[in-house]
Amino acid sequence: MVALKSFRHSGPSFADLVPYAGLVDNGVILLKDGSLMAGWYFSGPDSESSTDAERNDVSRQINAILSRLGSGWMIQVEAVRVPTADYPKESDCHFPDLVTRAIDAERRAHFQKERGHFESRHALILTWRPPEPRRSGLTRYIYSDTASRSATYADKALESFSTSIREVEQYLANVVSIRRMMTRETSERGCFRVARYDELFQFIRFCVTGQNHPVRLPEIPMYLDWLVTAELQHGLTPLIENRFLGVVAIDGLPAESWPGILNALDLMPLTYRWSSRFVFLDAEEARANLERTRKKWQQKVRPFFDQLFQTQSRSLDQDAMMMVAETEDAIAEASSQLRAYGYYTPVIVLFEEDQARLQEKCEAVRRLIQAEGFGARIETLNATDAFLSSLPGVSYANIREPLINTRNLADLIPLNSVWSGSAVAPCPFYPPASPPLMQVASGSTPFRLNLHVDDVGHTLIFGPTGSGKSTLLSLIAAQFRRYSGAQIFAFDKGGSMLSLTLGIDGDHYQIGGDATEGGDGKALSFCPLADLTTDGDRAFAAEWIEMLVALQGVTITPDYRNAISRQVGLMAESRGRSLSDFVSGVQMREIKDALHHYTVDGPMGQLLDAEEDGLALGSFQCFEIEELMNMGERNLVPVLTYLFRRIEKRLTGAPSLIILDEAWLMLGHPVFRDKIREWLKVLRKANCAVVLATQSISDAERSGIIDVLKESCPTKICLPNGAAREPGTREFYERIGFNERQIEIVATAIPKRDYYVVSPEGRRLFDMALGPVALSFVGASGKEDLKRIRALHSEHGAAWPLQWLQQRGIAHADTLFPAD
């Protein structure tokens, strides 16, 4: 016979070390000891932009929630740092030109570098062990209804657990953004079969192996310990699935804590899982434990022989006296039930295929923990127990003896969330799953910048001169081209968008200057009365003529208004549509004289009195208005009013962006102020976002529509401003909702590198992460650069970007712009 005993007998396996038994309800797992477990994903507030009072308030609320729990409960807060390389795919972007495509390709390569960027995800696990049946048997006699008496122990335990976690979830939802880990079902084989996947079980599998993937549950979801198992090799440096496992334990707590004391751990540029386990004790159990500690220290206050012979040597241990006082304070807190006590076990788990690299990472984590004032050690003999203690639902392994209270726990657990932005464009008018506007950097954590909050994309950008405002606007315009059918209308000052506009073969108009030419080389002139097709067109034309007359100091009377409307109606049926045709046809001398300034015989005739309109609006239009702004109100207002009208007619639902650089020039004029107010209220329906950029904070405040700007522009981007803390400027930031900490961030940020974005979704200080290709087109705004760009454009035409990049020393320029 074959000796089969050695094959039939097996020792304990890894499945015997984990407690998971079965799935008993949606998102609820039963453990082998009868405990029930549920989990949530959550995102806490951004403490980097919060004041000390706000951080303390969050910690106070978390303590109030956790102090309700007692013996039998355990909470585990997990912070997972994972690599991210989810830059929008090239196939999801629709850049119509080589320049913006090259800029985005450069940014994609930057953000997809190996081990380049990481982001944090947070989870919370609650475990409850019901009291034994013999201890809860009396409760069935308290209730008189038949259902309560006939319900089984398991049903009552599950109902009690569901009620408790629902209350905890409701309380936590007031502090953090939270989502329950649920069981989901999908149809297979033509809806003949239903497959079940549980998010909590998937997270457990991730904690065990470090690999995140869905796990299909069996028809009867029991014996889950065998599904979650992995190959474990025990040792000083254990191996799981052929990957080395490192565990760093936090074992020395400082004398005091404050909210977010370990937030630096949540920003490290490496992959790890930080587990914080807390096993709750009832007030009675906590007092009993604390009383034993008090007696131990009390015995050390007086020397042994003084206690033995009842003498008074007056040699007292002052340290022991302090410990007794602190322990008595802790007993009082436990008795008040304002704070709960329990056993706290924090560990950081790392996986790595190379043992030497794992050791380096563990030492880096240990150094960071020690720098924060904590003790830390890299586990060796205790590594397996420490790893087991980090797994969801494991309450028996690696119990750390000293008690801490829930107020300290609220300071220690990872609640801070670095806002990473939406992974898709939040605007519902864009195609589903459209990529975000652009990805920028902030340390080792990337940030997806979107101007939109739901369907509102209006944005306010403000900061002092020379802090990088024009570069940001140009990059926003370049990255906005990723959306199919996108159209951009920019009002520029100083030629900061000239290089980008010419590079993408857009239309650049220098209105009112000596070189009044369009992008096609033809002289730019307007024929505002060219389109009189609809009643709306004729109404605008009549109103526009009335405005010209009023700007010349003539009071509009009903007779004048009727004469203007009558002449506009006649012109709608004739071929001549120029302003001179209108003047020759209108019968009132006062109107003729008032409009003389705008005809070919006057100084503005070159712009406003053309037979045909020279403005052909394309998908990217840039209007240089610096010269126009210096021509006075009588000349400025008619031109911009007409341009605004032409742009409004182009807004048919395609993704659109209107950029107003140096918007303080427009905020100071009643006509444009009212137009901006109107745009902010109605253009969102046309899928158009308005970006207002200004360097004059005082002008924005005096504009009279600062409240409209604050309410209608949910996204605000602040440029570094060293004067933000000074009186006068501080009040403006406070008026738009900034707190003391946010003002401090703006004041200490680095000009031309840092930008601070604030929206209802979150707050973040970011860096645009510009490469040399992007800088060549969005950052070239100096006079010498613009002069050289104009010369190259004149000499090489559409091929000038290649010459420009080669002159700037970019070696791979020929690969970005291949010859036809």
Swiss-Prot record:
Q: Which InterPro entries match?
A: AAA+_ATPase (IPR003593), CagE_TrbE_VirB (IPR004346), CagE_TrbE_VirB_cntrl_dom (IPR018145), P-loop_NTPase (IPR027417), T4SS_component (IPR051162)
Report the GO molecular function annotations: ATP binding; ATP hydrolysis activity
SUPFAM superfamilies tied to this protein: P-loop containing nucleoside triphosphate hydrolases
Top-rank lineage group of the source organism: Bacteria
The positions making up the signal sequence are: 1-15
Q: Does the keyword Mitochondrion apply?
A: no
Q: Binding residues for ATP, per the UniProt record?
A: 463-470
Q: Which UniProt keywords apply?
A: ATP-binding, Conjugation, Nucleotide-binding, Plasmid, Signal
- Family note: Belongs to the TrbE/VirB4 family.
Q: What is this protein called?
A: Conjugal transfer protein TrbE
